[in-house]
Swiss-Prot record:
Source organism per UniProt: Shewanella sp. (strain ANA-3)
Record: active site: K76 (proton acceptor)
Binding site for shikimate: S25, K26, S27, T72, N97, D113, Y232
Protein known as: Shikimate dehydrogenase (NADP(+))
Gene this protein is translated from: aroE
Self-association and partners: Homodimer.
Pfam families per record: SDH_C (PF18317), Shikimate_DH (PF01488), Shikimate_dh_N (PF08501)
Length: 292
């Protein structure tokens, strides 16, 4: 009797998201759906990294065969510092949400948050060309979105923040990009001095999570203004409720941005960008069920 030849099952390509906390993460579900849609075979898990142990957790993951990783709060800046090479978006954002282990063993970092935002905005609003846009907030979420918005050819990008100097610092940084190509489109304005109606208002702050609002004048909202909150939930966020009360034409939450940035990450790793509409509907339905 001859021995049957042994058959080895190839190891799954492993991916993960690192954060702390991480139990709430929808990334494993999203990437699992993307894998099914694109007929890719892979695994994707959520990893709780110790606050003081992100680098060790990440390197252990890569040493064990990990191919790529997403990074969420509070580790995006640490991930940036660990990269051997970076995309233009990541370099200017000063933060990374997507890591790839390259064939030579080095780590490449990208920031797909802004790309996900712009993809979702275009899906809802069409072209962003020539639009007058207000970006509320000057933290990491805002910083990661500025270059993609400028590349989408917005007409004007006004940045406002409770601390005016932080908004001005971002304008100073991005005014230098590509030999000042975007300098005439960028402006920092204090919240109390905002004037005129905007075509699009984007809230990058997390104020809605606490049911709070940035101190904005209702005069910035017109009957054709679209408002976008990067936060999301089963019900309209506090910011989007306020925008509707001021007569905004349309309000959009950040669930599509979450799915959009995941699709960009998936494309970086797998070479194919999945359609997001079906996954977005599944997540939206799940939010409603979980809220009941």
């Amino acid at each position: 009797m001859t021995d049957m030849p042994s058959v080895t099952t190839p190891a799954l390509d492993r991916y993960a998201v690192f954060g702390n906390p991480i139990g709430h993460s929808k990334s494993p579900f999203i990437h699992g759906q993307f894998a099914s849609l694109t007929q890719q075979t892979l695994s994707y898990e959520a990893i709780l990294a110790p606050i003081d142990g992100f680098e060790a957790s990440l390197r252990a993951f890569f040493q064990a065969g990990g191919k790529g990783a997403n990074v969420t709060v509070p580790f995006k800046e640490q991930a940036f510092a660990l990269c051997d090479s970076l995309s233009a978006e990541a370099t200017l954002a000063g933060a990374v949400n997507t890591l790839s282990l390259l064939a030579d063993g080095t780590i490449y970092g990208d920031n797909t948050d802004g790309l996900g935002l712009v993809a979702d905005l275009v899906r809802h609003l069409g072209s962003l060309q020539h639009k007058r846009v207000l970006l509320v907030g000057a933290g990491g979420a805002a910083r990661g979105c500025i270059l993609p918005l400028l590349k989408a050819e917005v007409g004007q990008l006004v940045i406002t923040n409770r601390t005016q100097s932080k908004a001005q610092a971002l304008v100073d940084i991005f005014s230098q990009v590509q030999e000042g190509r975007y300098s005439d489109k960028l402006q920092a304005v204090s919240m109390s001095e905002l004037s005129g109606v905007f075509d699009l208002v984007i809230n990058s702050t997390s104020a809605s999570l606490a049911g709070e609002l940035p101190p904005l004048s209702q005069s910035i909202i017109g009957n054709k203004t679209a408002c976008y909150d990067m936060m999301y939930g089963a019900k309209p966020t506090a910011f989007n409720q306020w925008a509707l009360q001021q007569g905004a034409a349309q309000v959009i939450d950040g669930l599509g941005m979450l799915v959009g940035q995941a699709a960009k990450s998936f494309a970086l790793w797998r070479g194919v960008e999945p359609d997001t509409s079906g996954v977005l509907k599944l997540l939206r339905d799940k939010l409603q069920v979980d809220a009941q």
